[in-house]
Amino acid sequence: VTLFSDATRQTVEAMRTGGVRRLVCVTGIGAGDSRGHGTFFHEQILMRFGLKSTYADKDRQEQMLWGSGLDWTIVRPGYLTNGPKTGRCRVLTKLDGVRAKKISRGDVGEFLVKIVGDEKSNRQTLLVDGG
């Protein structure tokens, strides 16, 4: 699987060419140093049997952003649901002792829109869940 890293490589190149600096990117719980902070099902079943190569590619995607020189923010949602927006969004940068919880796709979308113009989130990797 190279979908995420290929798309990120092309996006970063296009941004450099166009002089665009800001990128907010969604990867997922289990990418990079968030591995081990998901639910039991995510960590023991999905990551072992179904998503191993996908998350290896998400790791490559994140590494590209870290070295891109862009003003990036990586957002790693917890377990995504199709439920309604709740308005609850816990944002974490430190994961010690944390297990990600559920969050609706609507709440993630609302959070993404909110941080696009937030310079404090530049070069931050954030775990978001419903708390």
Task: Please describe what each predicted stretch is.
Residues 18-21, 94-131:
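Mid/C-terminal beta-alpha module of Rossmann-like enzyme folds, strongest
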Residues 29-35, 80-83:
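Conserved catalytic-site region of short-chain dehydrogenase/reductase
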Residues 79-95:
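NAD(P)-dependent short-chain dehydrogenase/reductase
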Residues 62-84:
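Conserved beta-loop-beta element that borders a ligand/cofactor-binding pocket
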Residues 33, 84-89, 115-124:
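Glycine/proline-rich active-site loop of Rossmann-fold NAD(P)-dependent oxidoreductases
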Residues 23-29, 75-77:
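SDR active-site strand-loop-helix element
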Residues 37-53, 97-99:
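Alpha-helical membrane-targeting segments
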Residues 1-23, 60:
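NAD(P)-cofactor binding segment of oxidoreductase domains
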